[in-house]
Swiss-Prot record:
Keywords: Ribonucleoprotein, Ribosomal protein
GO cellular component, one term: ribosome
BP term (GO), one: translation
Source organism (scientific name): Streptococcus pyogenes serotype M1
Region: Disordered, residue numbers: 1-44
Pfam families: Ribosomal_L34 (PF00468)
GO molecular function: structural constituent of ribosome
Gene: rpmH
Gene3D superfamilies to which the protein is assigned, alphabetical: 1.10.287.3980
Database matches in InterPro entries: Ribosomal_bL34, Ribosomal_bL34_CS
Keyword Acetylation among UniProt keywords: no
Upper taxonomic lineage: Bacteria, Bacillati, Bacillota, Bacilli, Lactobacillales
Family label: Belongs to the bacterial ribosomal protein bL34 family.
Domain of life: Bacteria
Protein name as it appears in the record: Large ribosomal subunit protein bL34
């Protein structure tokens, strides 16, 4: 059986990247929460 995680930089950015987070209300909420928590990296 093959592994379920087959990394792809493009898919990673499109689904979890900064611009994708900014494109939705909830995504912006995620970024705000990560800023509030003091995360060094906000998104993929």
């Amino acid at each position: 059986m093959k592994r379920t995680y087959q990394p792809s930089k493009i898919r990673r950015q499109r689904k979890h990247g900064f611009r994708h987070r900014m494109s939705t209300k909830n995504g912006r909420r995620v970024l705000a929460a990560r800023r509030r928590k003091g995360r060094k990296v906000l998104s993929a």
